[in-house]
Amino acid sequence: MNEDLGVFNKEFKEIINVGDAFDLLIEDNKDILEQLQEEIGFNYVRMINVFSPDMGIFPGSKFFNWTRAYDIFEYVESLNLKPLIILNFKNFSDYEILAILTSFLEYFNDVEGLNFKNFKFQFDTKIKKDLSHEIKIILEDQYNLEVLDNCYHLFDYTNSIYDTAYMLPYIIHNSIYNLSSLYYIKAFDTLDKQVNLTNEVFFGYPGLVNSKGIKKPSYYAYYLLNMLGNTLVSIDKGFIVTKSHSEYQILLYSFNESFNNLLNFKNVDKIKKTQNVTNKLSINILNIKSNTRIIEYDINEKSGSSFDYWISMGKPKRLKKEEKEILHKSSFPKINFRYSKKSTVLNIQATLKGYSAKLIILKET
């Protein structure tokens, strides 16, 4: 391969979900979001329940206190993120909703220290059509603010598969092909909605990082995607090749035609039956004009997957300090270095087993 296919659009970096806005007042969650922003870098942070008692907004109130909302938006802006606010309202009348929104808009339009024009909005699927129409007119016509065309489906389901290495190829494949919305993926796990817990480590919440601050395989799907270049060189099922300056990036991931449906199983044991697929790939890179340093990042069920390490520990319901430290330190892709002398054709071969991903970076020296 030696021809470019155009710009590689990293749309997966546009939005990161955090769930309840109130969760961004919790220091552990803020630490996770800061690391996500540092290592991946998103554009918007989508939050729900901005207009709720947790945020100091109560049904029947004649005055609305926006202190918590301001603190959150100020923090978000400090991370070079912009707020995407879901317009969902619980236990408020239509009259109250309009009063709340009017107060919100007047307050943040006048307040100093925030770029209010960067705010975006999106309707909850449950909001009344006539009410949403009225709100949209206020936001767009009176304040010149953007409202997304599609509505947001509030998602609070759990699925044990979200914790597993299966999410590596699933997220990568759907991200590079823009096949399905990953709107349910969140920055971090939260405990407040979990009723039938069996442990405090992994409980099937769709966060990239669990409640102990341990990164899941899904985190590294985005981590590896973000290391891709901005120019698309080649793409097919199971791999994508990009480049930037004097560097090529080859991201390989395990692929089979049915794996996109496996989330419907909601059971780790069932997806184990499909994981014995082996993917072999061979890619030729042409016209490398100098010696090449090769860096490989590998993550799979046997290497780098916090969930599988936890299983190997015997699925402890609660982590001891030492166990937590082990999971923190070991949950990272395995890194290998190689060196290749100048050649007309550089052949890259790789074998992927089970649910896995491999990023190969070629740097001209």
Describe every region a protein language model picked out:
Residues 240-258:
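Hard-cation-handling environments
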Residues 26-31, 62-71, 97-107, 130-138, ...:
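Well-ordered, non-membrane alpha-helical segments in soluble/globular domains
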Residues 232-242:
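Short catalytic/ligand-gating loop segments at beta-alpha or beta-beta junctions
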Residues 132-231, 275-277, 287-289:
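Catalytic-core region of carbohydrate-active enzymes that cleave or remodel glycosidic bonds
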Residues 1-43, 47, 59, 67-68, ...:
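Mature N-terminal, pre-catalytic/accessory segment of carbohydrate-active enzymes
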Residues 256-365:
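C-terminal beta-sandwich/jelly-roll accessory domains of carbohydrate-active enzymes
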Residues 37-156:
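Substrate-binding cleft and catalytic face of glycoside hydrolase catalytic domains
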Residues 15, 45, 76, 104, ...:
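Conserved, mostly hydrophobic/aromatic
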